[in-house]
UniProtKB/Swiss-Prot annotation:
It is found in: Cytoplasm. This is Histidine--tRNA ligase. It is an enzyme of class 6 (ligase). Keywords: Aminoacyl-tRNA synthetase, ATP-binding, Cytoplasm, Ligase, Nucleotide-binding, Protein biosynthesis. Belongs to the class-II aminoacyl-tRNA synthetase family. Its main location: cytoplasm. It comes from the Bacteria. One of its GO terms (cellular component) is cytoplasm.
Length: 466
């Protein structure tokens, strides 16, 4: 016999954990829709030449290619060495770029989309790293231009999602790449490629530490003078403590730079100021975000606002949501300029980390809210009728289809995490009531049959409030 097992790099859950995962996914979807984002799904596989048009190196080495056995045999016979025609998507951004470019003539801009689907990467299997995982993305895409105001709205979406998820205190770290690049200009780092390389190093500060990054920037690969490196590291250590402090630090940055401040720096500061002002109007509490000049995001296509979100009491988990502003989403697929701003939540990794940290326990019981006991074979019709009435009343209900011992049926309900067990023996039927055992509160009570569904609904709603 073959030993049943899953391939490495996948997260497979038992039902109660899957329910918790699904509820988190539902919260994310609900909040995305609440802010007016529209659902999009793209195929799990794309044409290789389309998917990989702007990738290479590490990304291409992690791609899963798809090939039918017939095509594989033909390629072997002909000695062909080209890439297979199809490949599994490795993120949702490239498929979005293809999608918007393909349908730009029928889409309404600004195009607000959310996408919640699995993606695939051939990463080395190790603890906490997945080859198949859910990404939950939103993006606002403009045509030619896109107001900076959307950047503030995206931050409000982050706040709404994680407030409802209830997984702990969190904070959004906010920055603007133009501020970083403008400051680098003031320090004599003017070459565009060198600036991007410096930003990638800055993005590694939390993992590698200040000393390591300092040595790298001073070293032969970069050759930046030590004094300028110190200025850069001091600058990226800036953190705001409140909304007013964030605005004050932006003012101070322009004042300290004087009349020679680079235009890019001024533009980045102006954009951050507008985002901060609107975030306040949108009702995001000031403790939920702060200015952090070290946030760069390692991906080079970000050009303006950048976000990273972390749990305050669990910093070891790292970023739980990130994203930013980009100037041209689909330049490889269309001549139209399509600027945008968006974020992504890697839900699979986040769930795994929360479970590993013990933060998932107690989030979910069964999705079945009530179970109707089968007292004996003669009461099957009555049990099915009770279940039907409960379902009509909005209660997720299961019926025991075999008349096992009551203790066995109760044991099943307990192990399955079902809260209410409904019984109707001869006495209860004669009096027009049912007996209900609340396994959570360890209480038993009787309810008139016609009030059963509404009463259980009230109990379930009260449990949500508690």
């Amino acid at each position: 016999m073959i030993k049943p097992r899953t391939p490495p790099g996948v997260l497979e859950l038992l039902p109660r954990e899957q329910i918790a995962f699904q509820r988190m996914l539902d919260v994310i979807r609900r909040n995305y829709e609440r802010f007016g984002f529209l659902p999009v799904e793209t195929p799990v596989f794309e044409l290789s030449d389309v998917l990989l048009t702007k990738s290479g190196g590490e990304t291409e080495r992690q791609v899963y290619f798809v090939q039918s056995t017939g095509t594989l045999a033909n390629a072997a016979e002909s000695g062909a060495t080209r890439l297979p025609e199809l490949a599994l998507r490795f993120d949702l951004t490239v498929p979005l770029a293809r999608y918007v470019a393909e349908y730009e003539h029928v889409l309404a801009f600004p195009f607000r989309r959310y996408q919640i689907q699995r993606v695939y990467r051939g990463e080395r299997a190790q603890r906490g790293r997945f080859r198949e995982f859910y990404q939950c993305d939103i993006d606002v895409i403009g045509k030619q231009t896109l107001s900076i105001r959307y950047d503030a709205e995206v931050l409000a979406v982050i706040h709404a999602v994680f407030s409802e998820l209830g997984i702990g205190d969190f904070q959004v770290q906010l920055n603007n790449r133009k501020v970083l690049r403008g400051f680098l200009e003031s320090q004599g780092v003017r070459d565009g490629e060198l600036q991007l390389a410096v930003l990638r190093e800055v993005d590694k500060l939390d993992k590698r530490g200040v000393l390591d990054v300092r040595d790298t920037l001073i070293g032969q690969g970069f050759g930046i003078p030590a004094a300028q490196v110190e200025n850069i590291l001091t600058f990226v250590a800036t953190r705001s403590t409140s909304h007013a402090d964030a605005l004050a630090r932006l003012d101070a940055l322009i004042q300290d730079s004087g009349p020679e401040a680079h235009d890019m720096l001024r533009q980045g500061v102006a954009e951050l100021r507008e985002v901060l002002t609107l975030v306040n109007v949108l009702g995001v509490p000031e403790h939920a975000y702060r200015l952090n000049f070290s946030i760069a995001r390692g991906l080079d296509y970000y050009t303006g606002t950048v976000y990273e979100t972390a749990l305050i009491n669990h910093p070891q988990i790292g970023s739980i949501c990130s994203g930013g502003r980009y100037e041209n989403l689909a330049n490889h697929y269309t001549q139209s300029k399509l600027p945008g701003v968006g974020i992504s939540i890697g839900l699979t990794r986040l769930f795994w980390q929360l479970r590993d940290a013990g933060l998932i326990d107690g989030i979910a019981e069964s999705s079945v809210q009530a179970m109707v006991v089968l007292m004996d074979e003669a009461t099957l019709d009555d049990a099915l009728d009770i279940a039907r009435r409960l379902r009509i009343g909005g209660i997720n209900t299961e019926v025991q289809m075999e008349a096992k011992k009551l203790s066995k049926q109760f044991q099943y309900a307990s192990r399955a995490g079902i809260r209410f067990v409904v019984l109707a023996g001869d006495d209860e039927r004669a009096r027009g009531v049912v007996a209900v055992k609340d396994l959570t509160r360890e209480q038993q009570f009787e309810i008139p049959r016609e009030e059963l569904a509404s009463t259980l609904q009230v109990e379930l709603e009260q449990a949500k409030v508690m």
